[in-house]
Amino acid sequence: MAVILNIFPDHIDWHDTFDNYVSSKTKILSFLSKGKSERKIIGSNMGKVEKNLPKNFDIKSKNNLKVHRELLLSLGEATKIIGGVELYNKYLEYIKKYEIKYPHRMEQFFELKNKNITFFNDSKATNYHAVSEATKLFTSGKEEGILILHGITKETVENKLNLDPVFKYVIIPEDMNIKLGDHNAEIIHIKHISNLKDVLVKVLNSNQVVLFSCGGSSFNDFEDYQVRGDYFKNTILSMELQDD
């Protein structure tokens, strides 16, 4: 059994080229038993992995899945192999109860129910890919998205931020070097993250999702992503927003 995750340009720091990075990640496949014929490639990296496989390597593809589902499906496949159906069912029950409810990772911490405004803290998202995938999680909703970025970005040739069209506002600190892909959002620059509250007061309305998914490391303003996430949550709660 082998699980390969996160083959994306912002992870190539130590490999010089993207091809070297993919080759290094897929080396684990050489340790698999040759007697096993079925291989599953789950998610959006199939093409990158497939070209590193032997020609007689039989695979079954499950593609077009969002990042969180890729991780969950990979863990599910591993659970089946290790513990069979009984352990797999326990895993499913656990996921239903705890999936993406960890602090600073798509953490829903506040909601105005009457106005239908929900606030998410995703401070742990420190690269473009994590942010891009986070915005896709709201595609099916009727809410308008407000994305808040922050931090020191990783710059690579292939790396850019791709937003789901549901996000109509993007708030960016002036000192953040950001590379946006195609989008239809209004870009709002703020002098510093401490000025966030002033901007939010102007754009908050109703039927909205407010996503603090940063796209960069926290060290220019905070000790770590946890302190940054707590800062955002405290900022929102201190606004004492009314739900009437």
Locations of regions flagged by a protein language model:
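Short glycine-rich phosphate-binding loop at a beta-alpha junction
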Residues: R39-G43, V170-I171, V209-S213
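Nucleotide phosphate-binding/pyrophosphate-handling subdomain across enzymes
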Residues: L65-F167
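Flexible active-site lid/hinge loop adjacent to a nucleotide/diphosphate
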Residues: M1-N63, N220-D224
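Active-site regions of enzymes building and remodeling cell-envelope glycoconjugates
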Residues: M1, V49-V67, V166-K168, D182-N195
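Residue-level signal for inorganic ion chemistry
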Residues: A2-L5, Y21, L75, D122, ...
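Glycine/aspartate-rich loop-and-adjacent alpha/beta segment that forms the canonical ThDP
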Residues: G215-L241
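C-terminal helical cap/extension that packs against the catalytic core
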Residues: E155-V209, D243-D244
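Short glycine-rich anion-binding loops that position phosphate/pyrophosphate groups of nucleotides
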Residues: P9-D10, M46-G47, T126, I152-K154, ...
